[in-house]
A protein has these predicted regions:
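Active-site activation/catalytic loop segments of kinase-like enzymes and analogous catalytic loops
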Residues: 245-289, 305-324
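Catalytic activation segment of kinase domains across protein kinase-like and atypical kinase folds
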Residues: 205, 219-260
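ATP-dependent phospho-/nucleotidyl transfer catalytic cores
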Residues: 19-23, 46-47, 53-57, 112-128, ...
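Conserved ATP-binding subdomain of kinase catalytic cores across diverse folds
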Residues: 18-21, 25-35, 39-168, 242-244, ...
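Long, compositionally biased intrinsically disordered regions
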Residues: 347-350
Length: 362
């Protein structure tokens, strides 16, 4: 089967055996090397997870549209387009992906050399550089027509829908676990009035739909090995129309704390205002004039709602029997939910300070 897949592209040289590459969990990723007279050139070969992404054609239309736009913007500002964004290699038939005879879908990217992907924040500078990369992503795509993008995962950051899913999980209580987590359930219910804040502003036309990444974690950036600069945003499968605050908020949820995702000792779970300020500074400086004043004001809401949404999803999965998020022990999803709720409570205690940071860098 792999021979059939590799034969779909014109390589202009001898192709190595694909080697598993990276630490991603959704798509199967391989590195391949093509040997030719000019020398060796590496590529990334990926099997698209069509269980998660049911419309590979729409997904690849999104990725090709956005990366071509980013390449043009890179040329205009004198940057190297080969390092500023991913480059999809078309098949022999000039298609952005290949569907094999077994129905599997595959794509190829050019390998961005001399880069590294970080799995966790090793320094404040790493977090700042990630903020610059995602802020620049927003800046460069500010004029991209977001309405033309396909929704690759419907309702992905639709907080009211996540609340409805959570309430259903509580009501059904399939595993008989709800009685033991009433405190956590009440934590979610006590904030019900807040879950519509962002979608109501969007519906009222007060917030614009942007091109959003929707998975703005540190490990979705390629860093230059030499300079440490955040070069290139990767993992573009979830690029969709969305709210800028959600992209900002997901980064804060993931990065502005020092604890493990499933830390059982909640005294170790603390929201870091220092990291929040570092990220806000880099994100807003790189975004430039891309955002409206109201978008900037809603950035703390993005942090809080993305954290609550994630906590709800962990707790709902725990109530339903841990079918969605992989677990290594029985209460892992419950611990994950509790860390998100502790971060939320910390954000609430620091709410005025968070808004002052936004004001400082807006």
């Amino acid at each position: 089967m792999m021979n059939e897949i590799l034969a779909a592209w014109q390589w202009n040289g001898s192709v190595s055996e694909p080697i598993p590459y990276g630490e991603g969990h959704i798509n199967q990723t391989y590195a391949i090397t093509v040997m030719s007279k000019p020398g060796a050139k590496r590529y990334i070969l990926q099997k698209i997870n069509t269980d998660t992404f049911k419309d590979p054609e729409g997904l690849m239309e999104n990725i090709c549209g956005v990366t071509e736009f980013l390449r043009e913007r890179a040329k205009q500002r004198g940057a190297d387009p080969a390092r500023a964004t991913l480059h999809v290699v078309p098949t022999k038939e000039e298609k952005p992906y290949y569907q094999a005879t077994d129905g599997s879908c595959w794509r190829v990217y050019e390998f961005v050399e001399n880069t590294v992907c970080l799995q966790q924040v090793q320094s404040a500078e790493d977090f700042y550089q990630s903020a610059v990369a995602f802020g620049n992503f927003q800046h460069q795509l500010a004029e991209y027509p977001s309405h033309t993008l396909h929704e690759t995962i419907p309702h992905f950051h639709d907080t009211p829908k996540r609340v409805a899913d959570f309430q259903r999980a509580v009501a059904e209580d399939r595993m008989g676990r709800a009685a033991q987590v009433q405190r956590e359930i009440e934590f979610v219910r006590a904030r019900e009035a807040e879950y519509h804040v962002m979608v109501d502003l969007l519906a009222a036309g007060k917030l614009p739909l942007r091109v959003t990444h929707n998975d703005t974690k540190l490990n979705n950036i390629l860093f230059d090995k030499t300079t440490g600069e955040g070069l290139c945003v990767i993992d573009l499968d979830t690029v969709m129309p969305g709210l800028a605050a959600n992209d900002f908020g997901d980064s804060i949820r993931f990065g502005a704390n020092h604890c493990a995702e499933d830390e059982a000792d909640l005294s170790k779970v603390n929201f870091s205002m220092e990291l929040f300020e570092i990220y806000t500074k880099g994100f807003l400086q790189a975004a430039g004039e891309a955002f409206t004043p109201l978008e900037k004001q809603t950035l703390p809401w993005g942090a809080k709602l993305m954290t609550m949404e994630c906590g709800m999803r962990f707790l709902a999965d725990y109530l339903e029997g841990d079918h969605y998020f992989h677990i290594n022990y029985e209460t892992q999803n419950l611990n994950r939910a509790r860390t998100q709720f502790k971060l939320t409570a910390d954000m609430e205690r620091n709410w005025d300070a968070m808004q002052k940071v936004i004001e400082k860098y807006k």
